[in-house]
């Protein structure tokens, strides 16, 4: 299988669209109709950059907010409500990864506490780590970015906070907010490293573009994101290796 590279390395594209998931969950006809109306309204919402003189008109998209930013210059090429707040869900893990890479090493040991696995509901993304289990930071970040493993994100925060920040989980969350502000993010608040829902955990399309541009500068991040399949070897508590694949369809051919 051939890996695709190209424009994905030049532009940061952030889109907040929630209706497809909600529509699947909706059981009542009136609720589906309401969601369909909201979806159509999002398509009709004005695009900020279309009001610029002598600027190419951008396409309508089914999204509450969207942005296309050139990573080299920071120029915004397309924007639709880029500063409106939204719940980021798993793209939170981009900031988690950035903070971990900037403050630790890939050879660090990540240890899983009871708290790290207790956050999970039955349908949350996970690779089945157990309390007391240990893996390397490198293995952990592959699990965070390729498998979107929520318990691993929590353990990365705990371990980095403990090993490098003279604190623990809460110290890492403070660092996430500090780093976000340093990047110029003005509409974000981070309360966890995984993105599981919290009313006080939010960001904007513009802020996520800034975060994505920053983490993309890290060679370790690019290497992980260009990996199609990864194997975590047996651990101190698990005899079998864990295998997961890249789910980004633009990278497969």
For the regions a protein language model found, what residue spans apply to each?
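Domain-terminus/edge residues, biased toward the C-terminal soluble/receptor-binding domains
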Residues: 1-2, 185-189, 197-253
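Sec-dependent N-terminal signal peptides of Gram-positive bacterial secreted proteins and lipoproteins
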Residues: 3-25
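Active-site-adjacent loops and short helices of periplasmic peptidoglycan-processing enzymes
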Residues: 26-206, 210, 215-219
């Amino acid at each position: 299988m051939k890996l695709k590279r190209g424009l994905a390395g030049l532009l940061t594209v952030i889109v907040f669209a929630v209706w497809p998931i909600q529509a699947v969950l909706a059981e009542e006809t009136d609720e589906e109709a309401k969601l369909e109306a909201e979806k159509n309204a999002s398509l009709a919402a004005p695009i900020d950059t279309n009001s610029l003189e002598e600027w190419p008109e951008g396409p309508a998209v089914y999204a509450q907010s969207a942005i296309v930013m050139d990573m080299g210059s920071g120029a915004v090429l397309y924007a639709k409500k880029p500063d409106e707040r939204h719940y980021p869900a798993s793209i939170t893990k981009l900031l988690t990864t950035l903070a971990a890479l900037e403050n630790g090493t890939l050879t660090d040991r990540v240890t899983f506490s009871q708290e790290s696995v207790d956050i999970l509901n039955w349908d949350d993304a996970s690779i089945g780590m157990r309390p007391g289990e240990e893996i390397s930071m490198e293995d952990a970040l592959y699990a965070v970015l390729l498998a979107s493993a929520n318990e691993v994100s929590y353990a990365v925060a705990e371990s980095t906070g403990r090993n490098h920040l003279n604190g623990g989980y809460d110290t890492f969350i403070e660092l996430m907010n500090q780093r976000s502000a340093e990047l110029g993010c003005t509409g974000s608040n981070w309360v966890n490293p995984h993105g599981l829902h919290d009313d006080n955990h939010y960001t904007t399309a513009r802020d996520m573009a800034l975060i994505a541009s920053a983490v993309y500068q890290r060679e370790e991040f690019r290497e992980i994101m260009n990996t199609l399949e990864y194997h975590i070897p047996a651990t101190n508590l698990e005899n079998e290796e864990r295998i997961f694949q890249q789910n980004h369809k633009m990278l497969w051919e």
